[in-house]
């Protein structure tokens, strides 16, 4: 992806692109830039022709038609993701809610060694001006859709931290560009009154 602080790779997003697709692209550009010192430009598909590659393809780009995921029948759901490489391109795709962002951070953490341990503490971003690696082809769908950490501290209120660690912040407002906030019931606690209204069931 980079050679002595420079790169030939461009981050490609579809037109139109969703908020999570743009967020995944922007975060990849930021952290890959910090890691390598290179500038990873984000471009949007336009017209019939693609700009020159090689690409890091994010989301449902037209490039996928020529380089499909080599794991047929994969169901990524809303939060799942897939990562694979097909020379010379790298592909990250995922579900429409949080999946594509989860894929971007899976690459940064599991393939490239980045870490975000605790809010307020500097992240661990390896310094790799020359960045060569072989990504593991994979598709993953979280077993649990509700992945909130019930630990009341800065973690509970930090949407960025939860995004980078592929969870949902306990009480933070999660922007639509981050995939929003899943709601399975009216609130996190004190729900019986709403789920089983006394006026209906105990009148």
Show which residues each predicted segment covers.
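Feature activates predominantly on carbohydrate-active enzymes
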Residues: 16, 24-27, 31, 71-203
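Acidic, contiguous N-terminal accessory segments
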Residues: 1-82, 125-138
């Amino acid at each position: 992806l980079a050679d002595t602080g420079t790169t030939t790779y461009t981050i490609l997003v579809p037109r139109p692109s969703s908020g999570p697709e743009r967020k995944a692209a922007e975060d990849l550009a930021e952290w890959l830039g910090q890691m390598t010192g290179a500038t990873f430009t984000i471009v949007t598909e336009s017209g019939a022709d693609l700009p020159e590659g090689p690409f890091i393809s994010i989301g449902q780009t037209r490039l996928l038609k020529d380089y499909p995921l080599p794991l047929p029948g994969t169901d990524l759901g809303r939060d799942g993701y897939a990562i694979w490489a097909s020379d010379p391109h790298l592909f990250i795709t995922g579900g429409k809610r949080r999946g594509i962002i989860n894929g971007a951070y899976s690459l940064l953490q599991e393939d490239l060694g980045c870490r975000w341990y605790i809010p307020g503490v500097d992240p661990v971003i390896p310094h790799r001006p020359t960045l060569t690696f072989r990504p593991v082809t994979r598709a993953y769908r979280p077993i649990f859709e509700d992945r909130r950490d019930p630990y009341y501290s800065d973690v509970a209120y930090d949407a960025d931290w939860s995004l980078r660690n592929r969870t949902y912040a306990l009480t933070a407002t999660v922007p639509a560009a981050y995939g929003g906030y899943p709601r399975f019931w009216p609130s996190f606690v004190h729900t019986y009154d709403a789920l089983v209204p006394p006026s209906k069931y105990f009148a």
